[in-house]
């Protein structure tokens, strides 16, 4: 009886080891499979001295919307307005006789023409309104943000990704466009 139990135990152990090895192989295969993503090269904007590379933002699809995962460094710490802008450009343009960083990106992407700034989940707001981007004390940003109304990568291609100085209250009151500051960093979504 002891010999039968011992043989059964070895058989179960061997079967379990094979099953775990197969499951681990499938897991590794899933991890290495190519997930479709867009990689946006982001530059800190300086129309006088020239732009400086500060990293990338990866955009991927999820069941809950598009996920924007930053891999950024060298930025001012704190919360920053984070938006998709209309045009695929980060070039400076002149406004009122002054060169403005990133003005070539145009305004917030608003294909439904709501003309309202709002929360990323609000149906009556710019589609380009994203959750605020958090930058750590060391200037790095790695926390992903979710855009629940955006579902497919093709929706955002041909626009730009903008980071503004200062936070974003997701409203047009008391200040327009969420009260965010100047355009700080930008990348074209290709």
Curated annotation (Swiss-Prot):
A GO CC term attached to the entry: periplasmic space
Residues reported in the UniProt entry to bind Zn(2+): 108, 117, 126, 129
Reactions catalysed according to its record: 2 superoxide + 2 H(+) = H2O2 + O2
Record's signal peptide: 1-23
Region: Disordered, residue numbers: 162-181
Single GO molecular function: copper ion binding
Gene3D superfamilies membership: Superoxide dismutase, copper/zinc binding domain
Cofactor(s) the protein requires to work: Cu cation; Zn(2+)
Cofactor note: Binds 1 copper ion per subunit.
Highest rank taxon of the organism: Bacteria
InterPro entries in the record: SOD-like_Cu/Zn_dom_sf, SOD_Cu/Zn_/chaperone, SOD_Cu/Zn_BS, SOD_Cu_Zn_dom
EC numbers for this chain: 1.15.1.1
Primary location class: periplasm
Disulphide-bonded residues: 90-186
Subunit structure: Homodimer.
Protein name: Superoxide dismutase [Cu-Zn]
Source organism (scientific name): Actinobacillus pleuropneumoniae
